[in-house]
């Protein structure tokens, strides 16, 4: 090994010693799966992938299988803590779900990550019950957003019914046997009235959303509120360069323009009539005025609050893993 390589390794070791995170390349992280088998087929992966998402079974095996192994260990230790606490108190304690938060920008792949984790965690030998909800369901309905002049701020913190989300998480953490989360439709771009997702006393709940790691500021006159992340036992941030996320967003917009936007009932049907050039300009304008602004102001600043950062390269593949030191 040459002097340059030694210097590079020394610099990396020094940086790691000062950072609150332990750094792994994808290959280093992948070795932590040990002999854990991959309980997922190619067909199942296709069903879990988000629209236009690029992910292979190799990446699932290298990144998500070791992560599911780590989380399974964490969940087991938490359940053991409840057992010994029950022994100490001399009475049975209610099981409390282990909550995992998944945060990151629009178009970075949060939904796919959340679905893969839910599936892998549910297939461990102890067969835990794993539920998944997205915070999109806690957006205010379009009617409310229009009344408040917030339609162009959709996805920003003020567009969410944060009190309802906090009540939901509080009920889950209190061990409520049945809790319901509202449902959001990307097709109609609105909350679906009367539709809910049941959360029935799971072992693990995965919560996916843009701003789930953000400290929420109470409105004037309101009492201080807990943060959404206060209810998390573990949190994950999906990271990538702005230029890459912008390109992925535009690519997804163009794909939707050729598919679901063509349905006359789709909220964004009008975009299906755009030329390719007009569609790129429109997607770029939406990205810059809404999604990039939200990323820079509200989402990216929360990255350091995560327990795990998954950093993607330009090809959408996870290249680096940063795990918070205990």
Curated annotation (Swiss-Prot):
One cellular component (GO) term of this entry: cytoplasm
Q: Give coiled-coil spans as residue ranges.
A: none
The listed locations are:
Cytoplasm
Q: Binding residues for ATP, per the UniProt record?
A: 104-111
The family database entries (InterPro entries) matched by this protein are listed as: P-loop_NTPase (IPR027417), PanK (IPR004566), PRK/URK (IPR006083)
The answer to whether keyword Lyase applies is no
User: Into which EC class is this enzyme placed?
Assistant: transferase
Listed GO biological process terms: coenzyme A biosynthetic process
Pathway it works in? Cofactor biosynthesis; coenzyme A biosynthesis; CoA from (R)-pantothenate: step 1/5
Mention one GO molecular function.
ATP binding
Q: Which reaction does it catalyse?
A: (R)-pantothenate + ATP = (R)-4'-phosphopantothenate + ADP + H(+)
Keywords from the UniProt entry: ATP-binding, Coenzyme A biosynthesis, Cytoplasm, Kinase, Nucleotide-binding, Transferase
Assigned EC number:
2.7.1.33
Q: Which family does it belong to?
A: Belongs to the prokaryotic pantothenate kinase family.
Question: Which HAMAP family does this UniProt record tie to the protein?
Answer: Pantothen_kinase_1
Which NCBIfam families does its entry note?
Answer: panK_bact
Name of the protein this chain belongs to:
Pantothenate kinase
């Amino acid at each position: 090994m040459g002097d340059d390589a030694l210097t590079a390794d020394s610099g990396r070791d020094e940086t790691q010693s000062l950072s609150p995170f332990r750094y792994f390349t994808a290959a280093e992280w992948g070795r932590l799966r040990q002999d854990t088998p991959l309980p997922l087929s190619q067909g199942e992966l296709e069903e879990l992938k988000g629209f236009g998402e690029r992910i292979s079974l190799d990446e699932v095996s290298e990144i998500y299988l070791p992560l599911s192994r780590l989380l399974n260990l964490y969940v087991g230790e938490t359940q053991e803590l409840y057992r010994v606490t029950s022994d100490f108190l001399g009475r049975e304690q209610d099981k409390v779900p282990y909550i995992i938060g998944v945060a990151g920008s629009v178009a970075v792949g949060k939904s796919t990550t959340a679905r893969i984790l839910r599936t892998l965690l549910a297939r461990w030998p102890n067969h835990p019950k794993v539920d998944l909800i997205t915070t999109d369901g806690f957006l205010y309905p379009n009617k409310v957003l229009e009344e408040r002049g917030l339609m162009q701020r959709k996805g920003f913190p003020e567009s969410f019914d944060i009190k309802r989300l906090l009540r939901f998480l509080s009920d889950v953490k209190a061990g409520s046997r049945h809790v319901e989360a509202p449902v959001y439709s990307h097709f109609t771009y609105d909350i679906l009235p009367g539709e809910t997702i049941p959360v029935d006393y799971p072992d693990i709940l995965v919560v996916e959303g843009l701003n789930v790691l953000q400290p929420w500021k109470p409105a004037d006159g309101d009492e201080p509120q807990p943060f959404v992340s206060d209810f998390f036992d573990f949190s994950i941030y999906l990271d990538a360069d702005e230029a890459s996320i912008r390109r992925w967003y535009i690519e997804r917009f163009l794909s939707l323009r050729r598919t679901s936007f063509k349905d006359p009932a789709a909220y964004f049907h009008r975009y299906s009539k755009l030329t390719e050039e007009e569609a790129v300009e429109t997607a770029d304008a939406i990205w810059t005025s809404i999604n990039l602004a939200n990323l820079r102001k509200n989402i990216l600043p929360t990255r350091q609050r995560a327990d795990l950062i998954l950093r993607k390269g330009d090809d959408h593949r996870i290249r680096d893993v940063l795990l918070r030191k205990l």
